[in-house]
Amino acid sequence: MEINYELYLITDRRFLKGRQLKKVVEDAILGGVTIVQVREKDVSTREFYNVAKEVKEVTDYYKVPIIINDRLDIAQAIDASGVHLGQKDMHLNIAREILGKDKIIGISVGNVKEALQAQNNGADYLGIGTIFPTGSKKDVDAIIGIDGLSKIKDSISIPSVAIGGINKTNFKDVLKTGIEGISVISAILDEDDIKLAANNLLINK
């Protein structure tokens, strides 16, 4: 499956400001988002399922891949395109056994060792970060910056997206590393005009 990782949106309902998640995701896709990850923390399984199913209606309509953060059961229940796993989540090999070879599995990495391990274990793509300080994620172990991103990117051959504090003022510097895409939350969701915010993060508008 050929995936376009150019503009990777991660959902966070804290930024909705009373707006409907489905509408926000649709506007983001219309603005240029190429892949969507549904990320829900501290909610019940049923609520996560309902949110993911709602988002999938939009991504299916626009033929955009939908990735579920962490929860393989939710990914299976809605027949998502794949999952994204952190370093402390289920081991990639087990996730692959459960989901099968046709699903996308992405792994969060913060250094060359983690990146090579994930690649060798069969990850489809990597989420590399944290690049810049960010307010969206509190448990940031280390800010790696552009230099750290470049080192990791140069060590691997699979697709990767950069994450962490990326916005319209710095995304071009990130893309100069040759990375396949950028992953954002607040740079799109915290803006009033979602479609424009997404479009402002595209290098070839």
Swiss-Prot record:
Residues involved in 4-amino-2-methyl-5-(diphosphooxymethyl)pyrimidine binding: 37-41, 69, 108, 137
GO biological process: thiamine biosynthetic process; thiamine diphosphate biosynthetic process
Needed co-factor(s): Mg(2+)
Residues annotated to bind 2-[(2R,5Z)-2-carboxy-4-methylthiazol-5(2H)-ylidene]ethyl phosphate: 134-136, 165, 185-186
This protein's UniProt keywords: Magnesium, Metal-binding, Thiamine biosynthesis, Transferase
Cofactor: how bound: Binds 1 Mg(2+) ion per subunit.
The organism's place on the tree of life at top rank: Bacteria
The enzyme's E.C. designation: 2.5.1.3
InterPro entries from the UniProt entry: Aldolase_TIM, ThiamineP_synth_sf, ThiamineP_synth_TenI, TMP_synthase
Annotated residues for binding of Mg(2+): 70, 89
Metabolic or biological pathway: Cofactor biosynthesis; thiamine diphosphate biosynthesis; thiamine phosphate from 4-amino-2-methyl-5-diphosphomethylpyrimidine and 4-methyl-5-(2-phosphoethyl)-thiazole: step 1/1
GO CC aspect terms: cytosol
Reactions performed catalytically: 2-[(2R,5Z)-2-carboxy-4-methylthiazol-5(2H)-ylidene]ethyl phosphate + 4-amino-2-methyl-5-(diphosphooxymethyl)pyrimidine + 2 H(+) = thiamine phosphate + CO2 + diphosphate; 2-(2-carboxy-4-methylthiazol-5-yl)ethyl phosphate + 4-amino-2-methyl-5-(diphosphooxymethyl)pyrimidine + 2 H(+) = thiamine phosphate + CO2 + diphosphate; 4-methyl-5-(2-phosphooxyethyl)-thiazole + 4-amino-2-methyl-5-(diphosphooxymethyl)pyrimidine + H(+) = thiamine phosphate + diphosphate
UniProt keyword annotation of Metal-binding present: yes
CDD domains (alphabetical): TMP_TenI
Any one GO molecular-function label of the UniProt entry: phosphomethylpyrimidine kinase activity
SUPFAM superfamilies, alphabetized: Thiamin phosphate synthase
Keyword flag Transferase: yes
Pfam families, alphabetized: TMP-TENI
HAMAP family membership: TMP_synthase (MF_00097)
Family: Belongs to the thiamine-phosphate synthase family.
Role according to the record: Condenses 4-methyl-5-(beta-hydroxyethyl)thiazole monophosphate (THZ-P) and 2-methyl-4-amino-5-hydroxymethyl pyrimidine pyrophosphate (HMP-PP) to form thiamine monophosphate (TMP).
Protein's name according to its UniProt entry: Thiamine-phosphate synthase
Lineage: Bacteria, Bacillati, Bacillota, Clostridia, Eubacteriales
Gene designation: thiE
